[in-house]
Amino acid sequence: MDQGTPHIVLAGGGTAGHVNPLLAVAGAIRDIEPTAQVTVIGTAVGLEKDLVPEAGYELDTIEKVPFPRRPDLYMLRFPAKWKRETAKVRSILETRHADVVAGFGGYASAPVYATAHKMGIPIAIHEQNARAGMANKLGARWADFIGTVYEGTGLKPRAGADVERVGLPLRPAIASLTKRIGDDRAAVRRESAAQLGVDPNRPLVLVTGGSLGAQSLNRAIASSAADLLAHAQIIHLTGRGKISEVRELVTASAGADVLTGIGPESAGQGDYHTAEYLERIDMAFACADLVICRAGAGSVSELAALGLPAIYVPLPIGNGEQRFNAEPVVNAGGGLLVADKDLTPQWVHEHVPDLLADHERLAEFGRKAWEYGIRNAAEIMARHVLQLAEPSK
């Protein structure tokens, strides 16, 4: 073991929402302290199994240990499974000579928090949601530092813990875009527009419901194509398996001639650009004047960091978690919040064209979003993690 090298173990995964911030902080740690040994504990079934090795980090895997939520057979098996996986975590932390553990939520985090606490290893937590998940609620009991994206997450830190709103560590493509648009937003817009086949000199609305799409959002926007196209171009990312219905609704509203795809070959072919998914969504962000989307924590944080006005349509499930994600930036003046049940073609007709025509209001939304957004969250979080590693070097 190199006594002068910080050994940092990051824990979390399952979804991109957990893995992307983890990898952003890992990269920031290496930027600040190139000698740091950074490894990750995750599961063999989450996105981390591919994304972590691809990013150049070693991944140690444990099984998922979700907390039981009802009295059933799993509840009876849970204690033995928890004991087995925490023993595995102890072995990993000993082998990795962990000086500090930083968790990002998800199934892998809870046993890592519990084991690190018993071993006396400092703990840092990052909570990206407005309402914290169960793993981070557990870890908050022992954490030395808690970084959040929102105030009022429901976490209950121990006495003496440091809690700070650090923001969401951004994906590399988005972090790079925040810097580039800060230097010359118009130039970045022109470059991205050429790649997407859109007109850089005409307003653009980006519509996205995520990789799976959002049926209510798709239908309300596509059915309003004629109203919207009078004021702007549209990039509509429909989600997998939903593009045919969107194109049919657009055709019924504005005619088939307005439809085209996304890419340089689409330039001049039509103003309603459709695709199921766009790998380089940062390019669409660079061209957008308004975004209409769900209100996942990642989406809200990225749009705020980029200073993009948005109409947020929270997913109508659970306890309204997505609404809590969007409320702070909307209350700060960075966009609008619309309930899923209220997003109808009539609502779009009555509100969106007027917003697109009111350039000053749209610009003010963008300014307020930029002021609310945090662009250096990965660096802030990384410095706190490295600071916790110092006493154990």
UniProtKB/Swiss-Prot annotation:
For this protein, the record's SUPFAM superfamilies field holds: UDP-Glycosyltransferase/glycogen phosphorylase
Q: Which GO terms describe its cellular component?
A: plasma membrane
Catalytic activity field? di-trans,octa-cis-undecaprenyl diphospho-N-acetyl-alpha-D-muramoyl-L-alanyl-D-glutamyl-meso-2,6-diaminopimeloyl-D-alanyl-D-alanine + UDP-N-acetyl-alpha-D-glucosamine = di-trans,octa-cis-undecaprenyl diphospho-[N-acetyl-alpha-D-glucosaminyl-(1->4)]-N-acetyl-alpha-D-muramoyl-L-alanyl-D-glutamyl-meso-2,6-diaminopimeloyl-D-alanyl-D-alanine + UDP + H(+)
Keyword terms, alphabetized: Cell cycle, Cell division, Cell membrane, Cell shape, Cell wall biogenesis/degradation, Glycosyltransferase, Membrane, Peptidoglycan synthesis, Transferase
Among InterPro entries, the record links this protein to: GlcNAc_MurG, Glyco_trans_28_C, GlycoTrans_28_N
Q: Where does UDP-N-acetyl-alpha-D-glucosamine bind?
A: 15-17, 129, 171, 211, 322
Recorded E.C. number(s)? Answer: 2.4.1.227
Q: Which Pfam families match?
A: Glyco_tran_28_C, Glyco_transf_28
Question: Where is the signal peptide, in residue numbers?
Answer: none
Q: Name one GO molecular function term.
A: UDP-N-acetyl-D-glucosamine:N-acetylmuramoyl-L-alanyl-D-glutamyl-meso-2,6-diaminopimelyl-D-alanyl-D-alanine-diphosphoundecaprenol 4-beta-N-acetylglucosaminlytransferase activity
* Membrane topology label: Peripheral membrane protein
Record protein name field: UDP-N-acetylglucosamine--N-acetylmuramyl-(pentapeptide) pyrophosphoryl-undecaprenol N-acetylglucosamine transferase
Source organism? Bifidobacterium longum subsp. infantis (strain ATCC 15697 / DSM 20088 / JCM 1222 / NCTC 11817 / S12)
